[in-house]
């Protein structure tokens, strides 16, 4: 379960941008002004700029999604064994994950539905079934099946469209800050309307929880603008660095979700 938590928490900070209807406050710092001789933008001008910007950042529309993700991570003890996560999902229905080592030997298979998570350990011959709320308890992050699916695909989460409190333009792109109920999220978008960075901070200072993610290697092989390599720096008491490399990703194709538990497997708590 701890390994599953690492993968899910790592994907948690994959946030992009979505449309907005209002801005509570617009701040333009001196360092972020590009055209020095231009008039200072009014509040209405800034609202229009942000609306135009977010209209160009489109969400990924999908029915199904699958990908092979190579996961490398480092904690306080140094580099940990890397693994490969084969992920498949059907929108609003389920998430299927198969974890294997670099030799292709599968160790764990996971099935997540709207109300439960099942973890089958093929090496220990055990099956563990828990309510989906257990993921929230492990990660201390409130999310649903839909949230997890959006995160894996790369669509926005914890980026409140009605709570943008900061907007600035630089020579290289734009920055937007959203204040949500749990997190604040500073997103940097380049001039090609690709999300380059996302910095997520917990609003509860006692948890001292933060995450930085950088997006690389965008491509449109499947007709969808998709970041195939991401680096994350997660911090909450201890530091965790994660690298995700997406391969063989597919959208809207037929796929199966095999999850048959052998009779000899023992159910554990």
Roles of regions detected by a PLM:
Residues 13-16:
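C-terminal motif of bacterial Sec signal peptides marking the signal peptidase cleavage site
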Residues 19, 23, 164-269:
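Gly/Pro-enriched, hydrophobic low-complexity segments
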């Amino acid at each position: 379960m701890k390994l599953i938590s690492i993968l899910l928490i790592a994907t948690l900070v994959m946030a992009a941008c979505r449309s907005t209807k209002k801005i509570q406050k617009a701040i333009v710092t001196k360092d972020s002004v590009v055209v020095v001789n231009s008039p200072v933008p009014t509040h209405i001008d800034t609202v229009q700029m942000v609306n135009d910007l977010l209209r160009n950042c489109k969400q990924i529309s999908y029915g199904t999604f699958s990908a092979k993700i190579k996961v490398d991570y480092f904690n306080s003890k140094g580099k940990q064994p890397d693994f490969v996560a084969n992920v498949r999902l059907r929108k609003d229905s389920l998430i299927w994950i198969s974890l294997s080592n670099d030799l292709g030997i599968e160790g764990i298979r996971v099935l997540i539905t709207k109300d439960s998570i099942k973890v089958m350990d093929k090496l220990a011959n055990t099956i563990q079934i828990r309510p989906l709320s257990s993921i929230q308890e492990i990660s201390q992050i409130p999310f649903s099946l839909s949230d997890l699916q959006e995160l894996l695909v790369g669509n926005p989460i914890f980026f409140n469209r009605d709570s943008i409190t900061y907007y600035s333009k630089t020579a290289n792109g734009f920055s937007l800050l959203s204040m949500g109920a749990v997190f604040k999220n500073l997103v940097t978008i380049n001039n090609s309307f690709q999300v380059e960075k996302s910095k997520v901070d917990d609003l509860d200072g006692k948890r001292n929880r933060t995450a930085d993610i950088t997006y690389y290697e965008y491509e449109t092989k499947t007709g969808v603008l998709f970041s195939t390599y991401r680096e994350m720096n997660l911090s909450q008491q201890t530091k965790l660095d994660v690298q995700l490399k997406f391969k063989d990703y597919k959208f809207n194709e037929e796929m199966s979700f095999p999850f048959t538990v052998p009779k000899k497997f023992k159910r554990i708590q």
